[in-house]
Structures are given as C-alpha cells and as structure tokens.
Amino acid sequence: MALGQYILVKLETNRTRSSRLLNRYPKIIGYPIYATDFLFNRMIPKLSITKRVYFFLTKGKSRVLSLSEGLARLFSCGFEVIDYIKIGDETIILSKKIKEPAYDTTPTYGLLVKLDRIGQNGEILKVFKIRTMHPYSEYLQEYLFEQHGTKDGDKIEKDFRVTNWGRFMRKYWIDEIPMVWNWVKRDLKLIGVRPLSEHKFNTYPEYLQKKRVRYKPGLIPPYYADLPHSVEDFFEVEEKYLNAYEKNPIRTDLKYLFKALYNILIKGERSR
C-alpha cells in the first residue's frame, strides 16, 4: 500500500463480542459459548504452539482483538489513526499510511516483557516487567499522550491500553516485581527517578533530561515521597530530589525511602 493512502478497518472488539454473546443467550448457555469463543478466538491465536494452526484454519477472520491492540497494530504497520467510531457491534477505524511497517520482532506480547528505557548517561536499559497492557501498547503511547495528556505528570489520562487485571497489579506494584532483577544487576538503584521510555523522556524539559541521565534510575521514585498532583508538581519533585541527591546521595536516598514507605504503609498511598 502506497504512502498517503487511506484505509477503513472494521473491528469487533473483545468487549463488544463478549456483550453480544452474553446478551444473546441465557446465562446457562451464554457463558459456555463465550468461554469457548474466548479460548478459540482470543487465546489460541496468541500462543506460539497453536497460532499457526489457528491461522491456517481460519485465516484470522474470527480473531478477537481489544480496541487497544487493533489501533496499536495499525500504528506498528505504519498507519496513523485519523479517527474511529463504534457503529452497532463494530468499530470503524479510518487510518492513513504514513511510513513503512516497524517489523518489530519483539512486541510487548507475553506475560513478562522487556521494555526499552533511558538509563544513566542516556544508555538504553532492558527493564523487566509483568505486562499489564494489551499487546503492542507501546505503539499507542504517543497517540494517547497527544489525545489525553497525563493526569499527574506520570500516567496517561484515560489509558484504555491497561487491562482490568493490569490495573489491579499496578495498584499494588505487582507488575514491577521483575524490576528487582534490574536492581540486582545494578541497572537501577533502590531510590531514584523512574526509568522512562524514549517518548516519555522527550516530553520532559531539556534541563531535567540532562539532570536525569547523570544518575541511575530507581525502583522507588521520589513521586511516592512528595506525591505531586500536576505535571508542574511532578517535574518539581524530580528536580528537587536530583538536586538533593547531587549534594548528599546517601542522606537523600534514606530520607526519600522512609518518606515513601510512610506514605505507602501508613497513609495507604497506592499506584494511581
């Protein structure tokens, strides 16, 4: 397909499919039908040992995707999403070809993912996490940031890439447990600014970018010590921490560690 051409994609999302099946039949019939459809058209296509057989038999015609994965796959194939609308049981997506496909051989697909993050001296780190988003979600980050911005300088507002079980895991930091391995490898220190994706890093003011890359990122960010409520507050919190760390690293990290633990354990602060 040539650059500049438009394409309309018709998609029945996983939520629409589940609602359609469960509303069509009585519960005693609907739930077994939905479970079978979920297994065959959503899980089997994702498993490496079964997906080839699935696509050979179905050509992918009945495969079920989330809205997030559907949009993200278009971006990964070099398309820009112009707009999308839900009509009945189908979502219609208008897209424009703007570049060549990414040909990504390692998209965020499995349970455990390795994410590229900016580390000390601007080096790229492979950070380990449990996947809490729909597959290919990294391709939607810039699009959603432009559409919704952030709610507190950290997380994207109205981020539909996050799954229901992913929200629970994020709330209690379960998804970040594999990052302990990065700490063991000394890619990260215990307290420090959060390792960022390239896109997120580039949204920071240049002066703060330069300060960030002087030091290793951390497992526990200063966010949980000072609890910012806006983008401006978020930048100020990070700058305040980095300035203090530059003057007295050990005392600063101990201060922020105990303050973060107090907010989490005593005041009940959770990931937002």
Specify the residue positions occupied by each region the protein language model found.
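Short, conserved beta-strand/loop elements in beta-sheet-dominated catalytic cores
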Residues: 161-187
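Short, glycine-rich, amphipathic interfacial segments at transmembrane boundaries or analogous
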Residues: 115-160, 220-240
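Hydrophobic structural segments characteristic of membrane proteins
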Residues: 119, 178-272
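A hydrophobic, helix-centered structural microdomain
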Residues: 87-140, 250-272
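Short alpha-helix
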Residues: 50, 55-84
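Low-complexity, charge- and small-residue-enriched intrinsically disordered regions
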Residues: 34-63, 260-272
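Conserved class I S-adenosyl-L-methionine
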Residues: 3-42
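Hydrophobic, helix-prone linear segments
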Residues: 1-9, 13, 158, 164, ...
